[in-house]
Amino acid sequence: MGSSSFLVLTVSLALVTLVAAEGVKGGIEKAGVCPADNVRCFKSDPPQCHTDQDCLGARKCCYLHCGFKCVIPVKKLEEGGNKDEDVSGPCPEPGWEAKSPGSSSTGCPQK
């Protein structure tokens, strides 16, 4: 096998690998956007998901509160959201406390 044949084979294998990896990583993105995350982390939590397809229902895989989690997405105002509607993201889990200035759970049910 000549050096030019080897080069063509190597480049072809590299392209096939990149295309296959992109297909696995990408998947179909669900509607909505991930909520803003203004929490600073010293250490990331292990991921609970890698793509939107790992999440049930309408939930999206988003980086939130120090790790990737399945969360209810924020509605875009252009997609029929009400301008008075709170679109800051999902309410935190019970027991969550604001970890940075400006973080709050305004509009969430009280414990």
From Swiss-Prot:
It holds the Pfam family WAP. Coiled coil: none annotated. Keywords: Antibiotic, Antimicrobial, Disulfide bond, Protease inhibitor, Secreted, Serine protease inhibitor, Signal. SUPFAM superfamilies: Elafin-like (SSF57256). Residues 101-111 have a biased composition (Polar residues). Residues 27-74 form the WAP domain. Residues 80-111 are annotated as: Disordered. It comes from the Eukaryota. GO terms for biological process: defense response to bacterium. GO terms for molecular function: serine-type endopeptidase inhibitor activity. Antibacterial protein. Putative acid-stable proteinase inhibitor. This is WAP four-disulfide core domain protein 12. It comes from Papio anubis (Olive baboon). The gene is WFDC12.
